[in-house]
Amino acid sequence: MNKIYSVSHFSFIDGIILRKRKEMLKIIKKTLEKYNVLSCIDVGTTSYEENESSNYIIKNLSHIPNIISISNQEIKNPLFKEKILKSITQNFSNDEFFKLKSDIVISNATIEHVGSFENQIKMVNNIINLSKKKFIIITPNRYHPIDFHTKIPFLHWLPKVIHRKILSLVGLSFYSREENLNLLSKADLIKIMNDLNFKNYKIFNIKLLGFVSNFILIFKIN
C-alpha cells in the first residue's frame, strides 16, 4: 500500500478545510468532556505540515498527556510521545495491542486512503482493539458535490470503475487507484460497523454549501 497521501491545497481551499475541521473539533471536544482522557492514538498522521489544516485536530488535543502516532509516514512532530511507523491495515500482535491501547483513538481523513473495502474494515477492527473508551473516525462524504482531493465536482458520483477510468485519462492516475482513494458514503460506514457487529456508535454530519461534506463516526467502548 502506498503512503497515505496528504493533499497540498491552495490557501483558499485549505481555509475552507480548516473551518470544517474547527467544527469537527468542537464535536469531538464535546463528546470527550465527560471522560478523563490520559492517552490518545492518532491514526494516519501526516508528515506534511505545510497546510494549516494538517493534523489540526490532534494538534488541538495537545492537553492529553500521552499522544501516540500510528502512520506509514515518518513523523517528527514532538507532540507525539511515541511514533509507530506502520500502516493501520497491517497485522498487530497481541503484545502491540496491549502496549499501545489508549483511552481514545482518532483518525481523520485516513480511511478513504487505505485501499479496498476489506482494508477499511480491517482498519476499523484494528482501531477498536486499540481503544479503551472511544474511537473517532472522520472521512469525507462521497456524495458531496466536490471531491477536495481532485478538486473536480460530481465526477466521483459515477460508478467507481468509471470514475477511476476518467481520472486516469485526465492525468490523475494517483487518485484513479483504489489503494490511494476509496471514498465512502454514510451507507458504507454503516455497513462496516454492521459487518463488525458494532452497534454503540453515532455518526455526525458536517455540512458545506448545504451538503454533507464529512462524517464523524464516534464509537463508545463502555
Cite the ranges covered by each PLM segment:
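Class I SAM-dependent methyltransferase Rossmann-like catalytic core
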Residues: M1-Y35
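Short alpha-helix
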Residues: S176-N197
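Surface-exposed cleft-lining segments at the edges of enzyme active sites
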Residues: H9-G15, A109-E118, Y175-N180
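Soluble or luminal CAZymes and related metallo-dependent hydrolases
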Residues: I16-M24, E49, N119, L181-D188
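Conserved SAM-binding loop
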Residues: Y35-H144, F219-K220
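Short, glycine-/aromatic-enriched active-site segment of Class I SAM-dependent methyltransferases
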Residues: T150-P153, K160-E179
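Conserved class I S-adenosyl-L-methionine
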Residues: K134-I162
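Core SAM-dependent methyltransferase catalytic element
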Residues: Y201-N222
